[in-house]
Amino acid sequence: MTDTHSIAQPFEAEVSPANNRQLTVSYASRYPDYSRIPAITLKGQWLEAAGFATGTVVDVKVMEGCIVLTAQPPAAAESELMQSLRQVCKLSARKQRQVQEFIGVIAGKQKVA
């Protein structure tokens, strides 16, 4: 008699067969000795549809017989204020003091002499 824990449960595949891709590992030539190194090239509109638009940072995990590519979320854009602060940091000490005084005047903490 079959044990209840050994009965296969029906399940849906995580990846539909229409989304499967097959490719062959090719090679790239390395200068100066022109030795062949393994290379995998991925290209196609399906990459963008899968979340891998041009410029996307990709995390690569490598295991025996398995490579997992994960698209990283875009970094939060730096605020305009932080960009300005970075520019002020590059100024001379005298100009930095002028900026601080200006901020003080705008904030109402100081009065113009």
UniProtKB/Swiss-Prot annotation:
Protein's cellular compartments: Cytoplasm
One of the Pfam families matching this protein, by short name: SymE_toxin
Entry keyword annotation includes Transmembrane helix: no
Cellular component terms (Gene Ontology): cytoplasm
Biological process (GO), any one: RNA metabolic process
Main location: cytoplasm
Keywords attached to this entry: Cytoplasm, DNA-binding, Endonuclease, Hydrolase, Nuclease, RNA-binding
Ranges of residues in domain SpoVT-AbrB: 29-74
Entry EC no(s): 3.1.-.-
One example GO MF annotation: RNA endonuclease activity
HAMAP family, sorted: Endoribonucl_SymE
Function according to Swiss-Prot or TrEMBL: Involved in the degradation and recycling of damaged RNA. It is itself a target for degradation by the ATP-dependent protease Lon.
Family as reported in the entry's similarity comment: Belongs to the SymE family.
Protein name: Endoribonuclease SymE
